[in-house]
Amino acid sequence: MLSPQRTRFRKQHRGRMKGISSRGNRICFGRYALQALEPAWITSRQIEAGRRAMSRNVRRGGQIWVRIFPDKPVTVRPTETRMGSGKGFPEYWVAVVKPGKILYEMGGVPENIARKAISIASSKMPIRTQFIISG
């Protein structure tokens, strides 16, 4: 699963997901892509599940590019713990995704295969997405 090798700080604020994605909203590498339509945190497990689903469907042909990276730590408190006594420990990593962000790209395969693979990957995502074609 994806996670940063080292970070400057162990814990981060939760932040807000306002507006639409201004970066990473165009197809750069492949011909087909999966684009987010809603804001969300996407975990490294979900990213990996989508990638595996796509690569299983495409077999040897074609290439897949993952355009998001989980660089935000999410902290979790132990269960049945009283309030206070600091922030919890980092439990998992998420990628902050805004509407318009490209999640995956694919190339080197026919459109019908790409559409099928990307639809399976989209079912692994916790948000609404759309299939787009470059050009």
UniProtKB/Swiss-Prot annotation:
Protein name in UniProt: Large ribosomal subunit protein uL16c
Q: Where in the cell is it found?
A: Plastid, Chloroplast
InterPro entries the UniProt entry points to = Ribosomal_uL16 (IPR047873), Ribosomal_uL16_bact-type (IPR000114), Ribosomal_uL16_CS (IPR020798), Ribosomal_uL16_dom (IPR016180), Ribosomal_uL16_sf (IPR036920)
Query: A single GO molecular function, which one?
Result: structural constituent of ribosome
What residue ranges carry the coiled-coil annotation?
A: none
Q: Could you confirm whether the keyword Plastid appears in this record?
A: yes
What does the subunit comment say? Part of the 50S ribosomal subunit.
Instruction: List GO BP terms, alphabetically.
Output: mitochondrial translation
Family classification: Belongs to the universal ribosomal protein uL16 family.
Provide the primary localization: plastid
> Any one cellular component term from GO for this entry?
chloroplast
Q: Which UniProt keywords apply?
A: Chloroplast, Plastid, Ribonucleoprotein, Ribosomal protein
- In the UniProt record, does the keyword Ribonucleoprotein occur? yes
Q: Which Pfam families match?
A: Ribosomal_L16 (PF00252)
